[in-house]
Amino acid sequence: MVLLHCIFAINSKTILCFLASKCSSFFSISRRVGLIMQSGKAIFVGNIKGGVGKSTLAVYLTDYLRERYATRSVMLLDTDPQGTAFEMMRPLSRADDIRFLPIGDRYDGVSMTTLDGILRRMLSQDESVTIVDTGAGKLGNVWQMAMLCSTVLVPTSMSWTDLRPTIDFIKELDDRKEDYGVVNPHVIVVPNRTSPSQKNFGQLAEALEEVNAIMAPPISDLSIARSHGRDFHGFDAVSGTRFSEEIKRLGEFIIDYVISGELDRIYQRA
């Protein structure tokens, strides 16, 4: 096991990130294309724990990336049966840039097949980006979709009641990857709903030593985003707020390490 310690300095705050990787090559799994060779990127937003802000991050990140990459295809796929992300983003999206494919505990062959086809098509498109929002709960029926994605984005609060199931969720992903001999999807944990004054993320960094994951820049002030939830007008509507700056910072982190392929290169060298 090779452990890489990465330090990201952001707005004079230093966040300790742990990136753990096995010294292995990229392999193919059943019905899976080698993601490192693909131009498109897919980001799976998930956590077994509910109420950690998955849909909020998914919609704001989608809207930020659409603004950042006006000429690229940025699609939102909402698989959460509640359909929150779909309802928020539908007024701001073209018909071909958003889909609602609810996948619950019961197997839905039509939705699964459709989702599989859309993901593979997007991954084959040059410079496309796909955000997949999911409901709370175990990977269940969507684990194959998670394994197709470049990255799993896992939001969590700093409370132990959220951290413990979050670590269990990542361990399940690690087990799946070990079973198939792959390192994708990379796991990025987002400290979410943190106190604006919080500077010490040692508790989360220590918890991540148990798993193969890195820590992204934190997000605070989600109360601002929630206040816009019922009347969602996109990233521009929260312009000038701390939340806006933090979403932008997270978006640039995703661009630098996921969309650019830098995480793929780091894992290749490990």
What is each of the regions a protein language model found here?
Residues M1-G46:
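Extreme N-terminal, non-catalytic leader segments
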Residues S55-V59, T166-I167:
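Motif I (Walker A/P-loop) of helicase-class P-loop NTPases
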Residues M75-L76, V132, V154, V189-P191:
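Structural beta-sheet core signal
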Residues T166-G181:
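Conserved C-terminal guanine-recognition region of P-loop GTPase G domains, centered on the G4
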Residues R193-D236:
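Beta-strand-loop-alpha "switch" segments that mediate conformational coupling across diverse proteins
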